Amino acid sequence: LGDVYKRQSLYTADITRTFPTNGKFTDFQKKLYQAVLDSQQAGFEAAKPGATYSDIHHACMRVIAERLHDWGILPVDVEESLSPEGQQHRRWLACGVAHHLGLDVHDCAQARYESYQNAKIRPGMIFTIEPGLYFREDDLLIPPEYRGIGIRIEDDVLMTEDGPEWISAGIPKRIDDVEAWMADMAAEGVKA
């Protein structure tokens, strides 16, 4: 997992990619990676002028909870997990899934909840969408094949009048594209 940022003319970018160290995802890794990618896409689809960070967060979390349930990991049904009293899915994704970008990588991270999580997203705002799944090595409540795996996909988004635009779209994130990128780097002698 590589989480990198770039500062240009005082402004920042923040992007994360997860790579298979040998250049190819296993079928099991593909399943987990695709869940995170689908979660990110759900967050992107929820992002529109007038939406809130909470809307993006809930869209991403629904996909994560659904997949964890499908895999038999979530100890309750999806709706119970997504309820304010539940949140069992947060065991494997404990952080938020979006933040402002600007002069700081986590711009406005100290803002009050009502003026950040529930504030309306307006055209001109730039933010990330970055869901993930993190399975601890010592988590005995999950099957062994999940343990020690962490996946996050983070991209930068510009909100326009017409909706969101990926501004980090040039960096591969689809499974086939990541594997092709890894193969290109290996051919150039770059090691993962």
Segment roles from a protein language model:
Residues 2-192:
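Active-site neighborhoods and metal-handling regions in enzymes and metal-associated proteins
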